[in-house]
Structure formats: structure tokens, C-alpha cells
From Swiss-Prot:
Its EC number is 6.1.1.5. GO terms for molecular function: aminoacyl-tRNA deacylase activity; ATP binding; isoleucine-tRNA ligase activity; tRNA binding; zinc ion binding. ATP binds at K608. Monomer. A motif ('KMSKS' region) lies at residues 605-609. This is Isoleucine--tRNA ligase. A motif ('HIGH' region) lies at residues 47-57. It is found in: Cytoplasm. GO terms for cellular component: cytoplasm. Catalyzes the attachment of isoleucine to tRNA(Ile). As IleRS can inadvertently accommodate and process structurally similar amino acids such as valine, to avoid such errors it has two additional distinct tRNA(Ile)-dependent editing activities. One activity is designated as 'pretransfer' editing and involves the hydrolysis of activated Val-AMP. The other activity is designated 'posttransfer' editing and involves deacylation of mischarged Val-tRNA(Ile). It catalyses: tRNA(Ile) + L-isoleucine + ATP = L-isoleucyl-tRNA(Ile) + AMP + diphosphate.
Length: 1040
């Protein structure tokens, strides 16, 4: 045990402890120590290797590390591979920027696929190293050496194997469907990639007329639709109405007496006409006819952009195209009650089109540009205004404006998405959705309401589009026959199978990515060649494989614990569950925890453009890793969003400084007295020692309970409360005088033994969240025979030391002291001035008998009287309860009560209800008030009250001044950076003390008074006593 000198530097401590761990291979030794104990399988939700870590990922990894350190200290064999997301758009978009590429086409024409893919790999690996070091800087212990990397062949092979399983179970299919499409990244996206990626946009809002084709039956009649995507009108093939809604044929008369008939849902006629009047000279309108929507089915109309697109003329010749169709999806929430339907550009449109055997027409390319018609080569959104202008010229616009609404964006490049029909590969989730829901109920969710959110999300999920038209990802292991009439395909499940099936001589090296696998050719049963589909897998498929691909397993090993952020509930939690259901028919995790988002102090999302981003490296540099870790877990409940606050970081710093000061106080006195821990000293414990020993074991027990859940906020709050309130502000104050006793006094040694025991237990339970300071303290306190590292110890509750009776007794004494201190504050009677006496009720007599010395010393009280306080008692009838009990007899009862002796009545009612003049009086019928003299302050306790005599005497003033002087001299010693044992010489002017008082001061401050000395430190103060007197104090101190 070494003396603690100087101020603590948490950042330097981080570096020192990390060196100790690394030089002594502590992580590896802990793994070895626990290898024969039960497994605790953890799956690391992989962060993208696309840049540096941020505060959210720091929080995420701190949660993980805290739980895993706890489990290691419970002797679990923790399987803790780190994981990384290394494929997909997050990497590709960054690499495109590095090459200054403007489009997907540039990848192939300006760089080359092979170079681009190699650069993606290099980019991912480089960022992995950077981020790994940042995590290590936070003190994160994971198996970094054997981390799972989705770019490795074994992981890719696991993906292929799982896809073949899906095929074997008839859960894989290729289909033409409408889905999300990013025109910048030129790829399809899955539904879960878009959740949470909606942004407010300002789009056109246009009401358009479609003329009824049969002018004889419906002269000058138009169906009116509303859309925010005028660019899709070129592909309009149907208009949908609700079969059960009422539709009005509205005769519209313009100022020039021209007439038209507009068909609009009756409930929306007024709103639509109101808008129309803003841009049309409408004189009047009238509903001339009403029909049900189903009566409109089959009526043919003329597409609004017939002349602008030759293909529309072809479609117009088809009987069931450009007709009114029925759809339950049509609502009255807005618009006109008639829905423009382009089966190639909308999910509901697509389903309606299939129902009516309509063509699926989507005349745009991968970049979102038209491939035919008037606007050929134009990006669809760029055509909006010209399309509106064209429709205006054709007198088909009822109203054209703008509307702000939420719209899906690409989760990586943030481009507004398009809905587009393409052929993609799908996992048929609809077939196993019920299993996913049922198995989700068997998992422990933290917090438990996440289960409902997850299940509700699953219920509305569609089939999973897993194919991406990109480059950097797990290649789809699907080889398709080149003979269009054949259409057969093979799905490869392993490298061995690949080698067996390939017919050309392509070396299979250690990289199964494009473009190598694209060159492999197979032979179809029909005799033709088979080539691989060029697509790669959705990157969420990569991370979904983690539970088994990360450990190269082909059997389900359920994770004991996973945790990720709010946005992953319907993303990573879902992707791994869906794949596990497909492969193993079960959920892959036992316990699933969600945490919130990190925001700035005002609740705003952190953004580089706003300039409010907090870099965790900067916080660690200023405060140290442990303080950031503790803050992240204690700032609020994990599932709530965290508003980062430097002020709250400083509060955590105060907690850790308090811990360090408590530790240094203990160690420095132990070193001074050459103390060695010895359990024999437990034979001399006082009750306050037994109390803190019981409290640290109770804390350990409670911490284990909440860490098991895990409720990490409760864990950190409990530890913080123990450090600040139980250890520093109470126990150390209780034993301070015992540390000044003679060297071999058992009373002092038992206090040291208690402090040693408590500090050791405390750092063990603190270690999961604050590993550096815990290791630092442990290394200085450990004695021969103890494990090399604190992380080789076990968190243990010593139940035999938990004594609830002692805890309750000391807590009551502390409550009394706290009440005395609050009473002092109330009247500005500082603790340095003694109180002549306090009065406590009889029911606290046993506490006073046991702990009078604690109450006197900590409250600075000279005498304690145990009796009922005899102030003047007055009574007041409680009219609220009297009215309920006595109704019209209340006046009579009040008269009776007012005639009673208040003290006698109070004593009688203390034993229960009484009867007076035939009326039953209960305790709640009367309120009693004790009138307290001016020199007494009353403070309530759980049991009764404490009455504090604040009368000042000359003796009390002198005692207080003595303490004032001691405090000033101790402060001067601290300023001079003197060690505990160093003695001083003192001069003093301004206050006269007798010889006994001077000796008391000398003993406390380790000094001697001298008439005159040449001082190293001279200071002056004006000291004001509680009665208002002011003393001009001057003190000089010199090192002896």
C-alpha cells in the first residue's frame, strides 16, 4: 500500500491501467480463468466501418462492456467477439466521394469494379482499426483479435448456406414488385431500411381532370384526382374509387357560362371546389347526381398525358386499361376520393393492377430518368413543373399548389426515394410471420414495452427484398440459365459446392466478392451456361447472420444478451430474428435491450451542420474514460434519449473526486500508521462499522439484482449514493476522530479494517462501469495472495454481514443528525457552534441510548433529553372530516372540542377514538398544534420530531470560534500542500482562548502556538458568529 500524493489525473490513470492490462495480458488471463465455467453468449451488434465513433456508439459499447465485465466477474465464460458491418451502401457512398464519382455508372467507367471493390475493402479495414482504437480508449473489452468480419469467406459462406436453406424451405422467390428505389445509388431498398428515414419535403399538390371517354353518355364529364407525384401521371393506367362511398356528379358553371361535370366523392366536394375557385373562374356548382363508387366501375377515361406518350395510346386500346376500378384503400382523408393509379409506381397501385390484370408500366431507368415519351432522358422529379404546365395548357388542372409532407429518403445518401417496379429476390416473410410473433413473446425485452413495439412492427412488415444492384456486399449465390426459355437457377450453399458446380477454371482465392464470383460459369441441365445474377445481398442480411455466422455455427446458439439503439428494434433485432426463423425456426436471442438516442443539451439531434456534435474522444481527453462511461449509464434510464450535458459530466467528476478523496484519506492514514489488513480487527467493530459493512454488502446484492436485468441507471445511482452519502458524508465523518488515536488502539485499527474492506468491496462492484479507477485502487490495496487484477475477482455478497437491525438503527441516528443540520440551516446556526441541547420523543429512547455519541458529535450537540416536548398545545377542529361524520351536529361537536383541555385530549386520542357527550371523536377529527418558544426549532422525523435549543451562550460562542480557527488553519495546511504528519508553528491575533482551548486546536491541526514567528503563510478573515458579533482574525503558519 502506497501513500497517495497530489491530485488525481483520470486521463493519466486510463493510460497507466491500459498499459498494465496490456503488458500483463489481463484480458486473456480472465478469459482463461473462466473458460471452464458456463457460457454467456453475447452478439455484438456491428457498427458500420464508415468513420469514427460518435457519442451514441460510445454509449452502446459502454452498456455492452459493463454487462460483460459484470458477467466475467460472476465467473461466466463470456463469448464476446467484436463485430463489424463492412459491406453495403454506408461504405460504397464514402468511397464514391473519395473518387469524386457522381453516379453508379462512374464506378464502372471511371474507376472499374475491381478497383472500387478493393478500395471499399481497404476503406472498411482502415476505419475498423480507427474505431477499434477509439473503443479501446473507452476501456471496452471485447475479443478484438477474433472479431467477426462479414468480408471474410467464412462469413460469406454462412450467408450462402442460409440462403440455400431459405430456398429449400420454399421461402425464397424472384418476383416483380413495386418497392423503394434510390435513383442516386441505383438500387432497390428493403422496407426496414426506410423506417425512420422519412423527412419533410415540399412537393407539388395537383388536382387533375381525366375526361370520360364516352362523351355521349357522359358529356363533358371528368374524373378529378389528387396527387403529389405528377411525374407518375405519364404511367397512369387506372383510377380507383371506394365501392361504398357516395360520389357526386358536380355540375360546375364558369363565369363564361361554360359547363363541366366533375366526379368527386360527395364528402369532399366542398373542399375541392373551394380549392378550384382559387385558380378557376367558377360561378356556381351543383351536385346533379349521386352514385355509389361500385356503379362507376369499368367506365373508361382518357389519360391526361395521352399525346405525350405513345405507349399510353397502345394501352388505351386495351379494354380494362384507363378504367375506373374499385379499391378498399381509397379513403376520405383528403384529395377527391378518386385515386390515380400507376401500377408500376406504387405498392397499392401494383396490387390493384394485379387484381385487374393491368400492365405493370414503369418507364424509367435506374437513375430515375424517363426512357420514353415527351420527357425522355429527364429525371422524373425535374419533370414535375413541365408536366403541370402541360396539363394547364390542356385545361386539365383544377388546382396546382405545394404541400409539405413526410417522404422516404435513402438511409445512406439521403436522396428522396422513388417507388418503382423491378424484379428482385425476396424472402417470403409472410409465410413465417406468425412464428416470428410467437417466438418474440419468449424473449426477455428491456424495457418490456419494446416487445409490443417489435411485434406490432413485425405484423405490418412485408416480404424482405434482399437483392441490391450494387457492388460491395455478399454476392447472391444464384446462377441463372442464360436460356430465357429455360429459366432454371442454382443456389450455391458453400465454397465446396461452388467448386463442384463451376465449369471454368477460375481460382477460388480468399475473396468471394465481385468481380471474382461473376466470372464463374456453371452448366444448366438444359445444356446452356449459367451465370451469376449480378446482385449482392442487402447489408442488413449480413448483420442478421451474426448469431451463427460469427461463431461459424450451423446450429442455433441463442445469445444470452444483445443491446442496440432505438432505431434497431425493427432493423437489426428483426433481421437476425427473421433469418434465424428461416434457418432454425426460432428466435436467436434470450434477452434483448434497447437504448435511446444521444442528443445535445437542448434535445436537438447532433449534426455537423448545426455544430453541436460531441466527440467522445474529446470528452475522454478532458474527463477520462470512466467518467464518460459512468455518465452515459447514470444520466437517465437507458431506453430514454440522452441529452448530453457538460454540467452533468462535471457532477460525475465530483462523484469520482469524492471517491478518490475517500480512498486517499483511508490509505494515507493507514500508511502513516503502518497498517496491514487483518481480519482479527473485526472483533473490535463498533455499530457504525457493522453498518457500513452491512451497507456495502446490501449494495452489492442490489447491484447484482439490477445488473442482471440490466437496469444500469439503478446500478449507477445506487453506487453513486453509496459513495457520496454512505461513505464520504457519513461513515468517514463518523470515524475521523478514531484515525487520530494512538497507533495500536484497536478502535482505530477496526476502523481501518472496515475502511479497507468497504473500499475493496466498493471497487469490485464499481469495476464493470469504471474499470480504470477500480483497477487503480485495487492494485494499491491488494495484498499477497489476491488475484493479479480486479477482473480476476468475483462479485460476492457476504450475507452474514448484512444486518438490517443495525442498518435501521444507524439510519435513524443519521436521520436525527440530518434534521438537526436542516434546523441549523433554517436559522443560520452553523455547525461549528454547539447546540446546548435537543429533545427527542420517548419512542427514540433506545436509539439515543445506543447512538447518543454519534448524534452529539455529528450534530455538535452537548446534551440530549429524551421526553415528550412540553410546548403549548392548541387544537383545531377538522371541519372536513367532522362534516362527513356528524353532518348537522357539527356545531355541537365543535363546541364540545373547543371546551376540552388540548393536551389531555391529544393524549386520549393517541390511544384511539373516545366518546364525549354521546359523540364518538376520532383522531382525524382534530388537528393539534404545538406552539414552540422562540429559542426552539422543531424538525419532523419519521417518528416524532426533534426540538433544537438554539439559545447562544458565551461558552457556545467560544466553542464555535475554536472550530472556526481549526477550519482556517486546516485550509492553510492544504494550501501549503503539507502531509498529514508534518507539524506547523502558528501565530494568531483577534480571538483570545484559554489554555485548554489552545491545546485542543494544537492537537487538531498538528501545530504549536508561538508568540511571534516568521510565517510562510499569513491570512486574515472576518468571522461572524450566529449572534452577529464579528471577529477580525489573523493567522500565520510556518512549517516546523
Amino acid at each position: 500500500m502506497k501513500e497517495i500524493k497530489g491530485k488525481v489525473d483520470f486521463r493519466e490513470m486510463d493510460k497507466e491501467i491500459k498499459e498494465f492490462w496490456e503488458n500483463n495480458e489481463i484480458y486473456q488471463k480472465v478469459k482463461k480463468l473462466n473458460e471452464n465455467y458456463p457460457d454467456y453468449y453475447f452478439v455484438d451488434g456491428p457498427p458500420y466501418c464508415s468513420g469514427s465513433i460518435h457519442l451514441g456508439t460510445a454509449w452502446n459499447k459502454t452498456i455492452k462492456d459493463t454487462v460483460l465485465r459484470f458477467k466475467r466477474m460472476q465467473n461466466y465464460n463470456v463469448l464476446d467477439k467484436a463485430g463489424w458491418d463492412m459491406h453495403g451502401l454506408p461504405i460504397e457512398v464514402k468511397v464514391e466521394h473519395e473518387f469524386n464519382l457522381q453516379s453508379k455508372k462512374d464506378i464502372e467507367t471511371k474507376v472499374g469494379t475491381d478497383v472500387f471493390i478493393e478500395k471499399c475493402k481497404e476503406f472498411a479495414l482502415n476505419n475498423k482499426e480507427v474505431m477499434e482504437n477509439q473503443f479501446k480508449n473507452l476501456g471496452i473489452w471485447l475479443d478484438w483479435e477474433n472479431a467477426y468480419l462479414p468480408i471474410k469467406n467464412d462469413y460469406i459462406e454462412a450467408g450462402w448456406w442460409s440462403l440455400k436453406r431459405a430456398h429449400e424451405k420454399e421461402l425464397l422467390s424472384k418476383d416483380l414488385r413495386v418497392g423503394y428505389w434510390c435513383p442516386r445509388c441505383e438500387t432497390s431498398l428493403a422496407e426496414h431500411e426506410v423506417r425512420g428515414e422519412y423527412q419533410d419535403v415540399l412537393d407539388p399538390s395537383v388536382y387533375v381532370k381525366f375526361k370520360v371517354a364516352d362523351d355521349n353518355s357522359y358529356p363533358n364529364t371528368y374524373f378529378v384526382i389528387w396527387t403529389t407525384t405528377p411525374w407518375t401521371l405519364i404511367s397512369n393506367l387506372l383510377i380507383a374509387v371506394n365501392p361504398e362511398f357516395d360520389y357526386g356528379f358536380v355540375e360546375v358553371i364558369f363565369d363564361n357560362e361554360r359547363k363541366e361535370t366533375w366526379v368527386i366523392a360527395e364528402a369532399l366536394v366542398e373542399a375541392v371546389i373551394k380549392l378550384a375557385k382559387k385558380q378557376n373562374n367558377i360561378k356556381s356548382y351543383n351536385i346533379v347526381k349521386k352514385v355509389k363508387g361500385k356503379e362507376l366501375e369499368g367506365i373508361k377515361y382518357v389519360p391526361a398525358l395521352l399525346e405525350e406518350n405513345e405507349r399510353q395510346k397502345e394501352f388505351f386500346q386495351l379494354e380494362k386499361v384507363h378504367t375506373i376500378v374499385l379499391g378498399e384503400h381509397v379513403s376520405l382523408d383528403g384529395g377527391t376520393g378518386l385515386v390515380h393509379t400507376a401500377p408500376g409506381f406504387g405498392e397499392e397501385d401494383f396490387e390493384v393492377g394485379k387484381k385487374y390484370n393491368s400492365p405493370i408500366y414503369s418507364p424509367i431507368d435506374d437513375e430515375g430518368k424517363y426512357v420514353e415519351g415527351k420527357w425522355k432522358g429527364v429525371f422524373v422529379k425535374d419533370a414535375d413543373e413541365d408536366i403541370i404546365a402541360t396539363l394547364t395548357d390542356k385545361n386539365l388542372i383544377v388546382n396546382a399548389g405545394k404541400k409539405k409532407h413526410t417522404y422516404p429518403h435513402c438511409w445512406r445518401c439521403k436522396t428522396p426515394l422513388l417507388f418503382r417496379s423491378t424484379e428482385q429476390w425476396f424472402l417470403n416473410i409472410s409465410k413465417i410471420k406468425n412464428n416470428i410473433v410467437e417466438h418474440a413473446k419468449n424473449t426477455d425485452w428491456v424495457p418490456n414495452w419494446v416487445e409490443t413495439r417489435y411485434i406490432n412492427g413485425v405484423k405490418f412488415v412485408g416480404d424482405w427484398n434482399i437483392s441490391r444492384q450494387r457492388y460491395w456486399g455478399i454476392p447472391l449465390p444464384i446462377w441463372i440459365c442464360e436460356n430465357k426459355d429455360c429459366g432454371k437457377y442454382k443456389i450455391i450453399g458453400s465454397v465446396e459446392e461452388l467448386k463442384q458446380e463451376m465449369i471454368n477454371d477460375i481460382p477460388i482465392n480468399d475473396d468471394l466478392h465481385k468481380p471474382t464470383v461473376d466470372k464463374i460459369i456453371m452448366k444448366c441441365d438444359c445444356g446452356c451456361e449459367m451465370k451469376r445474377t449480378p446482385d449482392v445481398l442487402d447489408v442488413w442480411y449480413d448483420s442478421g447472420l451474426a448469431p451463427y455466422a460469427s461463431i461459424n455455427a450451423k446450429e442455433l446458439k441463442k445469445a444470452d444478451f444483445i443491446v442496440e439503439g432505438n432505431d434497431q428494434v425493427t432493423k437489426w433485432f428483426y433481421s437476425q430474428h427473421a433469418l434465424s426463423e428461416i434457418v432454425f425456426d426460432d428466435i436467436p436471442y434470450k434477452k434483448c435491450m434497447m437504448h435511446g438516442f444521444t442528443l445535445d443539451e437542448t434535445g436537438e439531434k447532433m449534426s455537423k451542420s448545426i455544430g453541436n456534435v460531441v466527440n467522445p474522444d474529446d470528452v475522454v481527453e478532458e474527463f477520462g474514460a470512466d467518467l464518460l462511461r459512468f455518465y452515459l449509464l447514470s444520466a437517465n434510464k437507458a431506453w430514454e434519449d440522452l441529452r448530453f450535458s457538460i454540467g452533468e459530466m462535471n457532477d460525475v467528476k465530483s462523484v469520482f473526486n469524492t471517491l478518490w478523496n475517500s480512498y486517499s484519506f483511508a490509505v494515507n492514514y493507514m500508511v502513516l500508521d503502518d497498517f496491514s489488513p487483518n481480519e482479527e480487527y473485526f472483533n473490535y467493530l463498533r455499530d457504525e462499522d457493522k453498518w457500513i459493512i452491512s451497507k456495502i454488502n446490501s449494495l452489492t446484492k442490489e447491484a447484482i439484482e439490477v445488473l442482471e436485468i440490466p437496469h444500469l441507471h439503478e446500478y449507477t445511482w445506487k453506487v453513486r449514493d453509496f459513495i457520496l452519502n454512505d461513505l464520504s458524508r457519513w461513515y468517514i465523518k463518523l470515524i475521523r476522530n478514531r484515525t487520530w488515536m494512538e497507533k495500536e488502539d484497536p478502535d482505530k485499527l477496526s476502523a481501518y479494517q472496515t475502511l479497507y474492506y468497504v473500499l475493496m468491496k466498493l471497487v469490485v462492484i464499481l469495476a464493470p462501469v469504471a474499470p480504470h479507477i477500480s483497477e487503480k485502487i485495487y492494485q494499491n490495496l491488494k495484498i499477497e495472495g489476491m488475484p493479479q487484477s480486479i477482473f480476476m475477482t468475483k462479485i460476492v455478497v457476504e450475507e452474514e454481514y448484512i444486518n438490517k437491525e443495525v442498518e435501521e438503527g444507524i439510519e435513524t441516528a443519521r436521520e436525527i443528525v440530518d434534521a438537526i443540520l436542516k434546523g441549523r440551516d433554517k436559522v443560520k446556526y452553523t455547525l461549528r457552534y454547539p447546540i446546548s441541547k435537543i429533545i427527542l420523543p420517548n419512542e427514540l429512547g433506545d436509539i439515543v441510548n445506543k447512538y447518543h455519541y454519534i448524534i452529539k458529535e455529528q450534530g455538535n450537540v452537548k446534551n440530549i433529553e429524551v421526553k415528550e416536548f412540553e410546548g403549548n398545545i392548541s387544537l383545531k377542529p377538522n371541519f372536513r372530516t367532522l362534516g362527513a361524520s356528524f353532518k348537522s351536529d357539527v356545531p355541537a361537536v365543535v363546541k364540545i372540542l373547543n371546551s376540552q383541555n388540548p393536551k389531555e385530549l391529544k393524549d386520549k386520542l393517541a390511544e384511539g377514538e373516545i366518546t364525549i357527550d354521546g359523540f364518538t371523536i376520532k383522531p382525524e377529527h382534530v388537528e393539534f398544534k404545538i406552539d414552540i418558544p422562540d429559542n426552539i426549532v422543531g424538525m419532523e422525523l419519521r417518528k416524532g420530531s426533534v426540538y433544537i435549543d438554539i439559545e447562544l451562550t458565551e461558552e457556545i460562542i467560544k466553542d464555535g470560534l475554536k472550530r472556526e480557527v481549526i477550519r482556517r488553519i486546516q485550509s492553510m495546511r492544504k494550501d501549503m500542500d503539507l502531509d498529514i504528519e508534518e507539524k506547523i508553528k502558528i501565530t494568531m491575533e483577534g480571538i483570545e482562548f484559554n489554555e485548554d482551548a489552545l491545546k485542543d486546536i494544537e492537537k487538531e491541526v498538528r501545530g504549536t502556538f508561538e508568540p511571534t514567528i516568521e510565517c510562510d503563510n499569513i491570512q486574515e478573515w472576518n468571522i461572524k458568529t450566529p449572534n452577529g458579533e464579528v471577529y477580525n482574525l489573523k493567522i500565520g503558519v510556518k512549517k516546523n
